[in-house]
Structures are given as C-alpha cells and as structure tokens.
C-alpha cells in the first residue's frame, strides 16, 4: 500500500516532516509558485540571517534578476525535473563573502509551481583543501630549512667574526658599517633559526589537555604584556571534552593568534579580542591513503574587531613568508598551521566587516574528560 503524497499531510505527519527538515544540517527552503518562501528550516534561517514566515525570493538579496539561483528555479519549474548546480557563488552584502554553495533544486509534486532548494556550503571543503595546500607549503619549508640551515649559518658565523675583528681596527666613522654587518648577520641567523623549527620532526609528548586552561594562560600572558590595554573576553563551552595535544605547543599557537589579534586591534579605544570554544559535531576530515575519517568537533576561536585581513591575502595567509607587517618574517602563521596539522586539526580564517576570526578545529581526546585534563595539564610543562 502506498501513501497518497498529493493530499495534505495530517498534523502528526506534518510535525514529523518539520522535525526531519529542521534536523538536516543544510539550509532547505521551499518556494511557492509566486516566488515566495513558503518554508525554511532552521539552518536556512541561520544561513540567510533572518527568520522568514514569508518573503519574496528576490527580496532575500541573494542576487539580482538573472542570478544562477533564480535561473535554476525557473528551469526546474519549466522542465519539472531536479537540477544540481555546483560551486554557485552567493556572496552578497547580506550573506557575506566566501558563500560558495552546491545547489539541489527540485519540484514539489504536491505543490504546483513549488520548488525546494537545498544548499550545500562548500566553504568548509574549500578551506580544508587550502589547509592541505598550507601543509604542503610547510613541508617545502621544512625541506629547505633542513638542507640549508648549516650551509647558511656556518659562513655567516665566519662573516660575523670577521666583522668583529675589523671593528677593532677601523676608525670610528667606519664602525657603524661593521656594526651593520653584525646586525644583519644576526637577523639572517634568527630567520634561519625560525625556519629550523619547521624541520623539527621529533615526537612530542601529548596528553588530554584542558583547552580552557591553555586559553586562560595565554590571556594572562597577553594582558601582562602586549595586550595590556585591550579588552579580552571569553565565551567557553564548559562541557567541552579534552583535546589530545601537547600543551606547550597549544600555548604557542594561541599566543601567536592573540598577538596577531592585538596587533590588528592596535590602539583603538574600542578594541576587543574574544576567545570562544564550542562543540561542533558533523565536521569530518578524510585521512589520505585510507578510508578513515577523523572527526573534528572541537572549535577554538580567536576573534578581533581590527580592520580585517585583505581579501587577496586570505587564501595565502598560512603560506610561509606571507605577511603584512613591515618587519615580519611571515613564518608565524605558517608554524601555527603546521602545529595544528601535526595534531590532526585544521585552521581557517574568516575576515569581513571589521571582524576577523581565526578558527581552529581539532579532534577530541577519547581518554579523558575536561576535569581529568585540568589536573593532568596542570602538572607542569611538556616537551
């Protein structure tokens, strides 16, 4: 016996259908024959940034007339068959930048002229692809650092020694030149030392770590130094499980991110940095060469209200030697990406409308609760 899907569902069936649609993690909307939104699930309301009981599709400011989405709706109505469209750009002032989606558009047989639209955001997939590219770039720096470090540092040491000897025999007016040679030699050696960090493949000690303890420690360091005049707030999920990691390296990661945020905020009187944690189920990353998928439910964010990151720099932000700072080396964020990648996680950056967010996604520890991690991670530093 088949159910008559052309008749209106009873109240119980309608309630179940609504619950099912609201449980779907993708935005779903239904458009009636007049182009009005007849239904939107919770994810759609979050996606569009509005709660709509009814509203014309063009009024959603997705695109002006002739947009790919509106054209797909017309095509489905005309042909009466579903259509898939991939990598559709829905970026707009309302939705923000980097709104790349895959669309599934299908007719609603029980509603003449009705069309259902399912949005699959590609932002996360594309960011993961970029993260893998960042790791490859970090590996290239690793190989370069490993092979060239000694070849560069040894002759530089000789040059510096020769400059120091010259300094003892030249006239006062020329000592500034020998001092310049020493200073520039020290600067290059310092850069090579930072590059050598990428080639350090020694295993590090990992244990269940309370991320809130790490963030609180970083906050204290920041407020006693470079961020003493900046308001730092936090919004933590107290039920968050522990992260299996090296505590010292996590401190290094978030101290770097908070320092970048403080430099972005600068001296503005309303400058603010916010630290947040949350549990986000449903994010899984495939492991290359296997069928295994790693779940990355732990989300740690550093937000700031600085001027933001230039759009043309965002895709390359974690590449080595990319920086907007006058005297920056461009290795800080590359090292952050390497550490997070070594822990099986990913890092991404969103920047728009004077708000920048660095988001770290990591796997949870299976061996201990957050309370256990608090006592374990407070026993002392780890290598």
Curated annotation (Swiss-Prot):
Instruction: List the InterPro entries.
Output: HATPase_C_sf (IPR036890), His_kinase_dom (IPR005467), HisK_dim/P_dom (IPR003661), HisK_dim/P_sf (IPR036097), Sig_transdc_His_kin-like_C (IPR004358)
Q: Which GO terms describe its cellular component?
A: cytoplasm
Q: Does the keyword GTP-binding apply?
A: no
Its Enzyme Commission number? 2.7.13.3, 3.1.3.-
What does the PTM comment of the record read?
Autophosphorylated.
Q: Which CDD domains match?
A: HisKA
Q: Which GO terms describe its biological process?
A: nitrogen fixation
Superkingdom per UniProt:
Bacteria
Location(s) in or outside the cell: Cytoplasm
Q: Which GO terms describe its molecular function?
A: ATP binding; hydrolase activity; phosphorelay sensor kinase activity
Protein name per its UniProtKB record: Sensory histidine kinase/phosphatase NtrB
Q: What does this protein do?
A: Member of the two-component regulatory system NtrB/NtrC, which controls expression of the nitrogen-regulated (ntr) genes in response to nitrogen limitation. Under conditions of nitrogen limitation, NtrB autophosphorylates and transfers the phosphoryl group to NtrC. In the presence of nitrogen, acts as a phosphatase that dephosphorylates and inactivates NtrC.
As its record notes, the protein acts as a catalyst of:
ATP + protein L-histidine = ADP + protein N-phospho-L-histidine
| Cross-referenced SMART domains | HATPase_c, HisKA
Matching SUPFAM superfamilies: ATPase domain of HSP90 chaperone/DNA topoisomerase II/histidine kinase, Homodimeric domain of signal transducing histidine kinase
* Keywords annotated in UniProt: ATP-binding, Cytoplasm, Hydrolase, Kinase, Nitrogen fixation, Nucleotide-binding, Phosphoprotein, Transferase, Two-component regulatory system
Q: What's the chief localization of this chain? A: cytoplasm
Residues of the Histidine kinase domain? 147-366
Q: Which residues carry this modification: Phosphohistidine?
A: 150
């Amino acid at each position: 016996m088949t159910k008559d899907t052309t008749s209106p569902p009873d109240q119980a069936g309608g309630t179940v259908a609504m619950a099912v649609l609201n449980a779907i993690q993708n935005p779903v909307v239904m458009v009636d024959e007049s182009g009005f939104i007849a239904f939107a699930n919770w994810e759609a309301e979050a996606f569009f940034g509005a709660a709509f009981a009814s509203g014309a599709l063009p009024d959603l400011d997705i695109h002006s007339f002739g947009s790919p989405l509106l054209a797909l709706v017309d095509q489905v109505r005309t042909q009466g068959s579903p259509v898939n469209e991939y990598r559709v750009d829905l970026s707009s002032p309302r939705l923000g930048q980097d709104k790349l989606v895959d669309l599934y558009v299908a007719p609603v047989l029980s509603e003449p002229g009705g069309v259902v639209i399912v949005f699959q955001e590609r932002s996360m997939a594309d960011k993961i692809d970029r993260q893998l590219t960042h790791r490859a770039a970090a590996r290239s720096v690793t190989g370069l650092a490993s092979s060239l470090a000694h070849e560069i540092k040894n002759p530089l040491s000789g040059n510096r020694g020769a400059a120091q000897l010259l300094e003892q025999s030249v006239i006062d007016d020329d000592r500034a030149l020998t001092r310049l040679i020493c200073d520039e030699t020290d600067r290059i050696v310092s850069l090579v030392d930072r590059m050598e960090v990428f080639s350090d493949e020694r295993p590090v000690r990992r244990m269940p770590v309370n991320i809130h303890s790490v963030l609180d420690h970083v906050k204290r360091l920041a407020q006693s130094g470079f961020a003493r005049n900046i308001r730092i707030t936090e919004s933590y999920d107290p039920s968050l499980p522990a992260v299996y990691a090296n505590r010292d390296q996590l401190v290094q990661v978030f101290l770097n991110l908070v320092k970048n945020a403080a430099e972005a905020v600068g001296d503005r009187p309303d400058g603010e940095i916010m630290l947040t944690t949350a549990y986000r189920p449903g994010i899984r990353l495939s492991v290359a060469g296997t069928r295994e998928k790693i779940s990355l439910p732990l989300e740690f964010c550093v937000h700031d209200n600085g001027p933001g990151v230039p759009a043309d720099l965002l895709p390359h932000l974690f590449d080595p030697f990319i920086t907007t700072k006058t005297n920056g080396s461009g290795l800080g964020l590359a090292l952050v990406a390497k550490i997070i990648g070594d822990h099986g996680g990913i890092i991404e950056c969103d920047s728009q409308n004077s708000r920048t967010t660095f988001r770290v996604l990591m796997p949870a520890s299976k061996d201990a609760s957050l309370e256990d991690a608090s006592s374990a991670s407070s026993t002392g530093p780890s290598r």
